Amino acid sequence: MSEDWKKKLNIPKKDTRPQTDDVLNTKGNTFEDFYLRRELLMGIFEAGFERPSPIQEEAIPIALARRDILARAKNGTGKTAAFVIPTLEIVKPKVNKIQALIMVPTRELALQTSQVVRTLGKHCGISCMVTTGGTNLRDDIMRLNEPVHVLVGTPGRVLDLASRKVADLSECSLFVMDEADKMLSRDFKSLVEQILSFLPQNHQSLLFSATFPLTVKEFMVKHLNKPYEINLMDELTLKGITQYYAFVEERQKLHCLNTLFSKLQINQAIIFCNSTNRVELLAKKITDLGYSCYYSHARMKQQERNKVFHEFRQGKVRTLVCSDLLTRGIDIQAVNVVINFDFPKTAETYLHRIGRSGRFGHLGLAINLINWNDRFNLYKIEQELGTEIAAIPAQIDKSLYVAEDTSAVPVPFPLDTMQGNARAAQQMPHPQQQAQLGGMPQPIPQQIQPPLAHQQAQPPPQVYPPQMYHQGIPPQQFANPPQF
């Protein structure tokens, strides 16, 4: 095959950051070895893909052979492309029917997945639609009057459209479930079972997840036909993520967070809380400290969540405070620090949270703020995951989580895939102060107490633009904040 077509491609700058064996331990295959159509290869290379990761090497040829797959691989190792690439190869652009259904548990993940489909398939003439709850149903119905080849969505909305006979799944030969453990939890299992009744009986099923509880195995026995099982989980946590804990009292957490902001070299950070109320209040307090931040949780309107997710992906703000809404599958490669302001209750939640950093074999840092009540949970999670969470040192080696060349971090494509839905609101939501994080911060232990940002002779690190640049929550919204 002539290689002249490659020279005409608009290939992005090479990502020169170091990677771990999570994505480098391959068999040496190339994407051309899978005999993909040239239009698809063009999209793959223009997206910055160079060689398939281990999960892609294993899954793509088996999926193209039209076998059912049950695949288990770590977060951030290329699972999405492992099912999107064969989907785009299997779908026939000239057949104006829904030929592939990709199911995901959250609206943000649906947006992200549909964007991957569009990015990799931009030369293939394949139409992708994303549909989720919280958006205008009429817009989705109107969109389905036009050709749709790949439908990406959350279970509730997909079932609604199929039940109304608006989404015709009778010729949908490929069914994909990402985050299968969550999709088959009590929240979604009955919906998924109902959706399957609208698909052809001989459809192909691809299930991907980082964990496989009993519910997934039961589903496999009932619905999959002699599935090919892939298990790349020699260990649960990503090799590139360094994990620490800081033992602090509840009232010290905010002070400790401020210390971390002044001490760490953060490209982008995600901070997790255990409740929506604490998400909003923490975002307000971070803004009061002079740092820009966004927040996101399930109670927000969908258009507001979309705006936050889109702008954080584009790097317009460096800090995002959120609930577990964004623990599933969200891929923002610029995130190099994850902070558990509230320590999670389960090992599964912990695994998905810290997996937002260290994406695709790169380096990341996870810091857990724990109090006296969290100590047993910390030990339990260490045992279940077979990992070690060390006490935070006085100085953290930057080589553990900072890329030498930050310009190499890829910028995601804009999330413009919610066709027919209303555009995101222009203003950020105003936090409703309904809970308290504790009293005024007290001095924290000496081993993790550098000078506070406002006490230093030099200004805060450049990676934290001040609020005056109108990034994050507009300061005028807090003109008369409640007293704490």
Curated annotation (Swiss-Prot):
Taxonomy, superkingdom: Eukaryota
Annotated motif DEAD box, positions: 178-181
Protein keywords: ATP-binding, Cytoplasm, Helicase, Hydrolase, mRNA processing, mRNA transport, Nucleotide-binding, RNA-binding, Translation regulation, Transport
GO MF, one annotated term: mRNA binding
Positions of ATP binding: 73-80
InterPro entries linked: DEAD/DEAH_box_helicase_dom, Helicase_ATP-bd, Helicase_C-like, P-loop_NTPase, RNA-helicase_DEAD-box_CS, RNA_helicase_DEAD_Q_motif
Disulfide topology: none
Motif (Q motif): 29-57
Domain comment in the entry: The Q motif is unique to and characteristic of the DEAD box family of RNA helicases and controls ATP binding and hydrolysis.
Role, per record: ATP-dependent RNA helicase involved in mRNA turnover, and more specifically in mRNA decapping by activating the decapping enzyme DCP1. Is involved in G1/S DNA-damage checkpoint recovery, probably through the regulation of the translational status of a subset of mRNAs. May also have a role in translation and mRNA nuclear export.
Protein name listed in UniProt: ATP-dependent RNA helicase DHH1
Organism of origin: Eremothecium gossypii (strain ATCC 10895 / CBS 109.51 / FGSC 9923 / NRRL Y-1056) (Yeast)
Lineage: Eukaryota, Fungi, Dikarya, Ascomycota, Saccharomycotina
